[in-house]
Amino acid sequence: MTLINHIPALQVLIPFFSALFCALTFHKFTSWLIATIAIITNLVITLYGISTSGNFQSYSFGNWQAPIGIEYSLDYLNQPIIIYINGVLLFFLLFGKQLINKTITKYIDDKKHHMFYSLLLFAHAGYLGVLSTNDLFNFYVFIEISSLATYVLVSKGKEAKALIGAFDYLILGTIGATLILISIGFFFAITGSLNIADISNILQVNYGSSVAGSTKLHLLIIAIVFFLTGAILKMAFFPLHFWMIRSYSATAPFILTYIAAISSLLGIYMIMRFLYFTIEVNLIYIPFSLMLRAMAITTLIICSYLALKSKNIKKIIIYSTALQIGYAFLLLSIWPAKALLFQLLIIDSVNKIGLFTLLAHIENKTNNLDIYSIKQIKDSPWFKILAALTLLFSASLPLTSMFIIKIKIFELLIQQSLLLEFIIVVIASVFGILYHLKLAKALFFAKEENGVIQIDTNLLGLFAIVTVHIFTLLYMHEIAEMIGYHTSMTIG
C-alpha cells in the first residue's frame, strides 16, 4: 500500500504521536514547534488525499475488513470539516503564540509548559478521530480522548475558578459520555455490530414500518434517546447548557478560540452522523425533529435574553455561543436546511474565534470585564478598527456573511410555513444586534475615570479573522454552492 492509502489513519495518528513527543521534550518552544509542524503536515496530507483520491476513502486497520474490523471512512462531509478544524488549530498556534504565553502558559508551572501543547494535540487527535471513524465504540473512545484533554485545557487560566469550571465540565461531560456508551451497548445488542454503515443496513432491513409499535422499535427508540441526551449534554444545548456558562466564564478566553470554535460544529456533525448514517431517518425524524425544534426555540428566547441582560463582556459572548447552538438545532430539525446549517456553523465558528481573540487581548490587560466599569482602551487605533469590524461581522449586520445566512433562514422558515419559528428568529436577531451594541459601547466609550489600558499584544490574529470574514463575504455564493454539493453528496 502507498502512503496515500494510509491517509485516513495518518491524520489521526500524526497529532496523537506528536502529543507524546511534546510530552517528552520538557521544553515550551520545542513542543510548540512540534505541534505546529504536526498540524501543517496534517493539513497538507488531508488536502493531498482529497486531490488524489477524491472525496471518499475507506481504511481498515490490520486488513480486517468492515464490519469485523475497525474502519475509518472519509467522505464529502467530514473531509472539509477535518480541513477546517486543522486550519483553526493552525491559526491558534501561529497567530496566537503571544496570547498563549500571556494568558494561558503564564499561569502554568514553567516545567509543565510543554504539557499544554501535548494536551492540545491529544484533544485534536480525539476530534479528528470522531470525524473519521466508522465504528461506534471507536467513536466513543475518541470522544473520551478529546474530552479528557479538554477538561485540563479549560482548567488553565488566571482565575482559580477555572479549576471549578473544569470540574463541572468533567462531571457533566462524563455523564454525557456514559449515556452515549449505554446507547452504543443497546445498538450492539440490537444489531450485533459496531460498524456504523453495517448498523444502518441492519436497521433498515429489520426496523421498517412493519414493526411500528413493537418492543423492537421501543428498544431502538430508547437507544436513540440515550445517545441524543448524552450528545446534547456534551454540547451544552438548552436546558443542559448550565455547565458551559460556569466553565467558560472562568477559562482563559484564548483557549476558547479553539474549543468553542469547533465544539458546536463537531457536536452537530456527531448528531447528524448518528441520525442520518446510523439509523433509518424515517422512523424517528418527525418526533425527534419536533422535540429539537421546541428546545431550539426555547434556547433562542432564553439565551438571547440572558446575553442582552448580562453585564459582563465574557458572559455576553458565552451566551452568544449557546444562542448559536439554538440556531443550529433549529436548522437541524428542518430537513431542507442541512446545507444552510453547515454554512451557519462555519461562519459562526469564525465569529467565535474573532470574539474570543478580541476578549483575550482585553483580559490580558484587565480583570474587570463589567460593561459599566471596564477600563478605557487608549492609544490602540488598529485594535479598535479590528474590534469594530469583528463586532460588525458577528452582529449579523447588513453586508456581512451572517446577515446573508439569516436572510436565507427567514426565507426557509417562510417556505416551510413555520411562522412561530420565524418570529422567534427575528426577535433573537434583534436581541443579537442589541447585545453587540452593548459590547461596542463598553469597548469604545468606556469612561476614562474607570482607568486606562493600552493593547500592545500582536494583532495578527484579529487581522487574519477580519480577512477571513471579508473573503467569505466576497465568495459567499461559491462557498454556499460547495457546502450544498458536499452535504447533498453525503446526506442526499
Q: Positions of the model-derived regions?
A:
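Alpha-helical multi-pass transmembrane bundles of energy-transducing inner-membrane proteins
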Residues: 112-122, 126-216, 233, 306-370
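Interfacial segments of multi-pass membrane proteins
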Residues: 153, 203, 248, 275, ...
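Transmembrane helix-loop-helix hairpins at membrane boundaries of multipass inner-membrane proteins
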Residues: 1-10, 17-118, 201, 480-492
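Short aromatic-rich membrane-water interface segments that cap or initiate transmembrane helices
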Residues: 2, 65-81, 204-221, 415-419
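Short helix-boundary/re-entrant hairpin motifs in multi-pass inner-membrane proteins
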Residues: 225-291
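Predominantly late transmembrane helices and immediately cytosolic-facing juxtamembrane segments
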Residues: 238, 345-362, 367, 420-453
